Amino acid sequence: MSTRPDLRNVAIVAHVDHGKTTLVDAMLWQSGAFSERDTVEKTGERVMDSGDLEREKGITILAKNTAVHYTGPAAQDLGLQDGVTINVIDTPGHADFGGEVERGLSMVDGVVLMVDASEGPLPQTRFVLRKALQAHLPVIVVVNKVDRPDSRIDEVVSETTDLLLSLGEDLMNEGIDIDVDSLMDVPVVYASAKAGKCSLDNPGDGQLPTEDLEPLFETILNRIPGPSFDEDMPLQAHVTNLDASPFLGRLALLRIHNGTLKKGADVGLARHDGTIQRVHISELLATEGLERVSTDSAAPGDIVAVAGIEDIMIGESLVDLEDPRPLPLITVDDPAISMTIGINTSPMAGRVKGAKVTPRQVKDRLDRELIGNVSLKVLPTERPDAWEVQGRGELALAILVEQMRREGFELTVGKPQVVTKEIDGVLSEPMERMTIDIPEEYLGAITQLMAARKGRMETMANHGSGWIRLEFVVPARGLIGFRTRFLTETRGTGIASSISEGYAPWQGTIEQRLTGSLVADRAGQATPYAMTNLQERGSFIVEPSSEVYEGQVVGENPRGEDMDVNICREKKQTNTRSATADVYESLTPSRKLTLEESLEFAANDECVEVTPEAVRVRKVVLDAQERFKIAARERRANR
């Protein structure tokens, strides 16, 4: 086997919000990828998060790659005068985007694991690290944010070592061969990505490291091997991601394992069904910094994009036509959460100019999403204008709906459900392992909240700083609508994150929402006068003088049953007074629900109407008489 000394492929993995994308920024700046003239807008902060939604929410959704060209002292020591190209893959930290993580890891030879110096390793860290160890990738630990005033560096390093060893033990029990000595000897780099500084020595809690990112580059070069390949093997390249370019059409991102790829060549495409198809490579692009530049040929270990293959799919391989040897397909965790997405069926449908409202447009958009999103499944339902979309978690699905909303779609979205399975004849549901950090005084409230959702406490640790860390195993459907209740109970201070734990037998019924809904009983405009008289009955989620229709949920009833209300009632006026003057002072402001909150808020007989201009919660059956008949039938059936 030969290796390439002038190339390193690295994935940066961490829990959400521990600073992966910020570190990539600092690496690009210090290796000179941006010229002095570049504006902040062009480079900005978190260059890798290029989507609007990613910038707003501050999370990475798609795994992306960039190339850092490094020519510093560490490269000179290894005798590489021209420097080293480090291909960096920035992976998402959310387990909901697990499909992205697995694809990212199939492209690299080593992993940089980032851990927050105060929070320590969290569930998503465990998730990604397990995947990396399964693939036998060397690990470098970066303790980030060491300059936080509440950092506890030594504890976090020992927690991370414990995590590595316990994962190694788990995998050995499953029959996977792990080198435990190498896990004991994992290098640790102390860093502050935002300041762009790091060192190999512990700077002390809350202190800034002294050097720039040189020690990190040095550790990457020394610890992570160059890509290895077999000189006698024919071409083998794995498609790990898809992209589109307005000029070149569909692009496939490849990692070349063996052989060379040339622009204009004819190669074989090994399909999912085992057939080999002859394809022509019309354009070959390599990454430099954040730009893609055209190149004539690519060697083993390179991560490149090819154009000219229209229907190429993720997980397929490019092979030699004379001697085809396809690579194994990429496997992704099964989806755990599903929801129905269909066209907007409410009386307000089609009011927005230029909105996309036909079933055909929705179906085409969902099919387009399937191309690049490996962890998604779309299944037909009994209605021709709605589809069941399955994904890893409700965040991934809510982000798909939000993207469609911004593209001008009008949709009806059902409440998220779990995807159940029959295992050995027993109905089973997906479970999640949840880690919760809360101040001590909320311990009782949170234990009660989790018990109501069939959560089982596994461990409880007191950090001694007034904070407690709890670990629960809980059914995935217990976490639908959990976040809002959790933040209310802990007054916004709690931190909760979860990760898939496989399947377990069905846990029984879970009470989702203890309150009922206030439902509009006629169409019209919500009047401040009616809302003032109704506000002691509950809280509202619509604004005064907004339009409502029959069957729309306009508020929350503190009692457990639904109540039909007339929110359009007008005040009988004497001829001189203004209609609204004396009402607005006494009206409590309405709650504004975002898309995710609406999905959590909706009861089982409700769905969410999503248009480019508004998000509304409504009953599935709009007519009050019909709803009454259905409820009576259910009561009779339960007797």
How should each PLM-predicted stretch be described?
Residues M1-R639:
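Structural and coupling elements of P-loop NTPases
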